[in-house]
Amino acid sequence: MNINDKIGIYPGTFDPITFGHLDIIKRACKLVDKLIIGVAENVNKHTAFDTKLRTSMAENEIKGLGIDADVISFNGLLVKFAKEQNASVIIRGLRAVSDFDYEFQMSWVNYKLLPEIETIFLPASEDTQFISSGFVKEIARLGEDVSKFVSKGVQNELINLNRIKNGE
């Protein structure tokens, strides 16, 4: 790691991590010298998986793909976390126009808080643009196959989650 290296943060709840997230991660790695995947301990959002498991799933996914990135959980303001990690850029994925409105507002707030940290938006690839963690959890809850959206390891975690919820 060089002092002049560009560090990027790709934040999210990753509840669970999907092929859409992995697509953005692969592409983001080409834009920065070091990528940090920030797993948010989001107190305002109920998550199916705890932070430790979401972090572990993300680590397993990137390791399995040979991606060189760090996975770090964080709580609080994203820009504060980015500053602590010496990041100069936040990378966000956009699935559809509906994502843009929210993400644009957040990037403006982040800029007002720390103008030295830029936000880059990466549009989702055509084959991942409609994948969402929420849809994946719902499909899995209904007992359907989610292999088009998540890896086998994540599928197994979803199966375990549903067994626990069903008292099995």
Swiss-Prot record:
It is found in: Cytoplasm. It catalyses: (R)-4'-phosphopantetheine + ATP + H(+) = 3'-dephospho-CoA + diphosphate. Its cofactor is Mg(2+). It comes from the Bacteria. ATP binds at T13, F14, H21, G93, L94, R95, E103, T128, Q129, F130, I131, S132, S133, G134. GO terms for molecular function: ATP binding; pantetheine-phosphate adenylyltransferase activity. Keywords: ATP-binding, Coenzyme A biosynthesis, Cytoplasm, Magnesium, Nucleotide-binding, Nucleotidyltransferase, Transferase. Homohexamer. Belongs to the bacterial CoaD family. This is Phosphopantetheine adenylyltransferase. It comes from Wolbachia sp. subsp. Drosophila simulans (strain wRi). The gene is coaD.
